[in-house]
Amino acid sequence: VKNSLFTSLPSSQTNIKFENKPASHNLFNILYYLYYYNGGGVATGDINNDGLPDIYFTANNKGGNKLYLNKGKFQFEDITQQAGVAGTSDWCSGVTMADVNADGLMDIYVSTVSNKYGLTGHNELYINKGNNRFAEESVKYGLNTACLSTQSVFFDYDHDGDLDCFILNQSHHPHANIKDTSNRRFVDALSGDRFFRNDISTIRKFTD
């Protein structure tokens, strides 16, 4: 379109060839899972501090996530495997980039749907080790929640200089809540939103 604000660039030019193909198995499909077609997520951030925003995509299938390193001039390189960030959970949803451990390097936090519908896994935290390498350390940081996560955000809610984490979870629509609405006052272990405070003693750890 003439004088358009945006221009669509083909994958042949950018080398971004990510595709999200939702997994369907064991009756896990749109008929049983209301959010089946919500899609994955995307986050941009400068993982190597070269001044260029890199891109991370999440997929609704195991090992389908992709990390693209920005080489400049709208050209990207798929470094997923060498970076170690393909993902190990069955169903990934949103993704957030933030400097979780305050070391000056951008980390990656992946939200996942797990512990229901036959889906395995947990939210994944990839800590940036430098040189475009990451290590999955969600257990170490206490952010390995296994629930119905849609998206997460990091922010300093208590103004103590470190990032805390809020996780938005989707509902699994339990029948008990429909019959007795008073049940909605209680936090559901799978679908209740989660808020983690960043606590530092000898190590950095998040507390729900």
Model regions and ranges:
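Beta-propeller-forming repeat regions
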Residues: V1-D208
